[in-house]
Amino acid sequence: MRHAHKKAKTKGSGGYFKTGEARGHHLQDGLARGYRFGFTAGSESHDGRPSRPIVHGPYVIAETDFLAPPGVTGVWAERFTRDGIFDALRARRCYGTTGARMIVRFSLGETPMGGEVTASALSGPAEFSARIIGTAPISACELVKNNREIDRAGGGATELNATLRDREAAKPGDYYYLRVTQADGEMAWASPIFVT
């Protein structure tokens, strides 16, 4: 066992970290390629503990500087049951944060985050609703279209209700998501709304 730990420390456990940092392996790259997925956040630190799991117990963790506290996934479930939560995840009615327990709502009319709307159903420029309850003042709430910021709101309060607009007509293949930044640096991302 000791030999395996030493090998992992000196050789690493594979190319996972480097591969994940390579160009083309990011969430935005997948969206640009047409993949449709919801945003979640979390970690896998092998100890099965939620929240901030780095605890020095009977096992020695020689290097912890590459470990970060896990994120938090929020879901908008119709039922507070196991099936209801998984239904919300499958429907992409979810968001991820860097760890702050924010509440994030994002919609385009009646279409919630993760949903799909046809371009023909939109009459003119799209108006999105954002409702955020932060754990610190909200410094920015950004509407991102096809990986580019197109509108922004903020104001410094811990709660924000905002209407964000796309000044151009949406077309099939477009996608929009919400990116929230608090004054303390914590962030959240709401799953995209996809235009078909």
For the regions a protein language model found, what residue spans apply to each?
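C-terminal functional module detector
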Residues: M1-T19, R23-T196
